Design a protein with these regions (language model features):
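Pyridoxal 5′-phosphate
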Residues: 1-423
Length: 423
């Protein structure tokens, strides 16, 4: 059995909703995806039957312990983490990054340098800028080419010095959609004796993630971007965690992972995370038999999840090609990202565009009236919008595809877009 779109879509109740008889088309996915039935059911079950705090001797507390461990085990499989106790949960990626930045800051001294990217979401920019202000650190900016929408890693080599302590970059841009060569970037960080912090929020819904192969020290993502609940996830290398002093209250355990998790977590959210990983594993088991052999270094759920993500990305590249081809056929549109049909593997299916006369927010409003959901603006990619020169003209219209979207939905967008551009 190959990719079965009908079976996929049947798992998501939100896709069947209509407004005044018009079905909803969800292209707002980079800001948050719909969830399958299994995720909502797991969260409800946790609240109704496993609602207790951790560490007790009684049944509901033991059930809660198992929920949390299941989520850690699931995310370890999803990310190919060496150990589940390297998985840290939090409210969201932004909160986790702000929290961790304070612990990392204890290792830094005035004059130390952090390399940041002009392609990143502000959640992987401003926490580090604030840290630099507090500690008198130097920020060195890695630009991207405005024609190729990619980094020149020779420029990164020039930015790295003996004072470089940390390199922070996103795996994929939430505005241009570019997939960055984070493995090469992390190799450069290691060679310089610097830590690497990877924002994987925009790549995790689309491609297999293997933190061991990437070679990073930290990797963050958000499960609500990959069909789960509103939760943030951090993976960190245990030997690097051991160098950090966590910000925590006195009764909290001193050991990983608990020392970096403040207060009681959302157990229902963690139940949803475990169910999200189960969802991917089921796709791998039922639809990705052809891909399983590409991941025979793994076993069980870990193998199934990675095979599923490979299958998903292959399908999404078809969607992306169709969308970009259609956008380029419309007069006045500029796609702010890679458009070469032979380079779809170097981007995720997040496609942003501008128009020579129509404002992004007006386009988004007009599409919303057609029940087509997109975002407009800078979408928190502040440095990206500035670099592209679109920050003062309303940013861009962002169309975000995922594996439950269809060619038919893309064609409906392309059919309705000229009217939206005309106002």
């Amino acid at each position: 059995m190959s990719f079965d779109l009908e079976a996929i879509r049947s798992q998501f109740p939100g896709l069947a909703l209509t407004d005044n008889g018009t079905r909803r088309i969800y292209f707002d996915n980079p800001a948050g995806t719909q969830v399958p039935v299994c995720v909502a059911a797991a969260m409800a079950d946790c609240l109704m039957t496993k609602n207790a705090n951790l560490g007790g001797y009684f049944a509901s507390s033991l059930d809660a312990d198992r929920v949390v461990q299941s989520a850690r085990d699931g995310m370890a499989d999803f990310l190919n983490a060496p150990a589940s106790d390297e998985i840290i949960f939090g409210q969201n990626m932004t909160t986790i990054t702000l929290h961790l930045s304070r612990s990392i800051g204890r290792l830094l001294r005035p004059g130390d340098e952090i390399v940041l990217s002009q392609m990143d979401h502000d959640a992987n920019v401003w926490p580090w800028v604030l840290l630099a202000r507090d500690l008198e650190l130097e920020i060195r900016w890695l630009p991207f080419d405005k024609e190729s929408f990619e980094f020149d890693l020779d420029v990164l080599d020039e930015l790295i010095t003996e004072r470089t302590r940390l390199i922070c970059v996103g795996s994929a841009s939430n505005l241009t959609g570019t997939l960055n060569d984070i493995k090469a970037i992390c190799a450069r960080a290691r060679a310089a004796g610097a830590m690497s912090f990877i924002d994987g929020v925009q790549s995790a819904p689309h491609i297999p993630v293997d933190v061991q192969d990437i070679g990073c020290d930290f990797f963050v993502c958000s499960s609500y971007k990959f069909f789960g609940p509103h939760q943030g996830i951090l993976w960190g290398r245990s030997e690097v965690f051991e160098q950090l002093e966590p910000y925590k209250v006195r009764p909290s355990p001193a050991e990983l992972p608990w020392c970096f998790e403040t207060g009681t977590q959302s157990h229902e959210g963690l139940a949803g995370i475990a169910a999200t990983v189960d969802y991917f594993a089921l796709i791998g088991q039922s639809m990705a038999q052809a891909q399983l052999g590409n991941w025979d270094q793994f076993q069980g759920q870990r193998q199934q999840v990675h095979a599923a993500m490979e299958l998903i990305f292959d399908y999404e590249m078809t969607l992306t090609s169709r969308l970009i081809e259609g956008l380029l056929d419309i007069d006045g549109i500029t796609v702010q990202g890679i458009t070469d049909k032979d380079a779809m593997g170097r981007r995720v299916p997040t496609v942003s565009f501008t128009h020579e006369t129509a404002a992004p927010d007006k386009i988004a409003q007009a599409l919303a009236r057609q029940n087509i959901f997109v975002w407009s603006g800078h979408n928190y990619a502040v440095e990206v919008a500035r670099t592209l020169g679109i920050d003062e003209t309303g940013g861009a219209v962002r169309i975000g595809l995922v594996h439950y979207n269809s060619i038919a939905e893309i064609d409906e967008l392309l059919t309705g877009l000229p009217a939206a551009l005309a106002g």
